[in-house]
Amino acid sequence: MNSDLALLRLLQLASPGLPVGGFTYSQGLEWAVEAGWVRGVDGFVAWQREQVHDTLACLDWPVLARLYHACQAEDAAAFGHWSRFLLANRETAELRLEEQQRGAALARLLDGWQLGQAPAWRASLELSQLGGMAWLAAHWAIPLRQLALGHGFAWLEGAVMAGVKLVPFGQQAAQTLLRDLGNELPAALDQALGLGDDQLGGGLPLLAIASSRHETQYTRLFRS
């Protein structure tokens, strides 16, 4: 696939229109706002910056890279291992369910395109959205770095749009946040791609607590 088509496919994978329900989850932010842990734009920036440099850089991106390389090598066993590793590192039932729901939705999209149907791959593809993204990126010859940045921006955009509704703040502030927090993604990715297998894993206790409390939050805008 030429570079222009690879770019278009990347934009498709990173699009908020991808039918995986990306904008239906707040990943604990809804409870954090209600509890007063996140107040105003500055509080939101601090909350998301921790996730960029912990969850994204120390877990999601390194695992995405390993899933991508497993697809390139046609190593279904390694792909399954890292898919399960990612799911095991989601610290709450809510976060694990979100991961599986996104993965199943993307797997159904692959079914519609008659892709990823081999039994050795199909079950693992349902475990996470990252698995489906890695599989499609390898299939479409999207470079790993571009894939990771596209995924990171899509994740950040989803978080900022949740912040618009919950914190709240306006669209001007939202775009400024996307610009400023987005500036931190390339350096965080450099760190992520340099980690060894024994260095992978993130842990944000307040995020885990917020996600757990969100499961039983009385009134919610976002899915649990």
UniProtKB/Swiss-Prot annotation:
Physiological role: Required for maturation of urease via the functional incorporation of the urease nickel metallocenter.
Subcellular location field: Cytoplasm
UniProt cross-references to Gene3D superfamilies, sorted A to Z: Urease accessory protein UreF
Record-linked InterPro entries: UreF, UreF_sf
Top-rank lineage group of the source organism: Bacteria
Family of this protein: Belongs to the UreF family.
HAMAP family: UreF (MF_01385)
GO CC field: cytoplasm
Keywords assigned by UniProt, alphabetized: Chaperone, Cytoplasm, Nickel insertion
Gene name linked to the record: ureF
Predominant cellular place of this UniProt entry's protein: cytoplasm
Matches recorded under Pfam families: UreF
Complex and partners: UreD, UreF and UreG form a complex that acts as a GTP-hydrolysis-dependent molecular chaperone, activating the urease apoprotein by helping to assemble the nickel containing metallocenter of UreC. The UreE protein probably delivers the nickel.
Name under which the protein is recorded: Urease accessory protein UreF
GO molecular function, one term: nickel cation binding
